[in-house]
């Protein structure tokens, strides 16, 4: 849980603090996040891993990303003068659709430079999270699973239930198509494929295919993601400087 801080100080402020290293380690342990300040700008790194936990608590044995932690943190990052850009490191197995889409919508709505890097996996609701950043990268060995909306537990076997599923699914398709280079029909083709997975409907795509189909912007690793983010930060700073000169 995020700590309450005095004034406008953010929980990730580490510069000039006597206990800065201890606070930084605590942020990495509790939130899987880190704040770094260098000559190319200040970057906040946030990991989104495991299962996206929504309104229902996941079992203690499952690694999760809690939406009630991430959402206020994203708002603070957007508002803070200390942070120039956001780097998202993704390795997800899916999770709560509403919670995942809520996080993805927040990221997509940020004005600050954002870059996502898919590592290991970006499965299910991890796909909208991956494309929510302004630039997305994927390592060659990472995989992304695209499948229809599913619900665990008992459901009512009525037409209205399947209509509800279809409406949620359309929201995901619309979001992914709007925030990436893949078309709706192509994404639906991957989602509804029946010959790709032995026990499920859908498709598993890897790094190169994710880029070639337009889902992810480019192949790359950590240094590539940081380089992309630094370029975006520099471009934004130049635009703001030019705007301030014109106003004055």
Predicted region positions:
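N-terminal organellar transit peptides
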Residues: 1-127, 132-147, 151-248
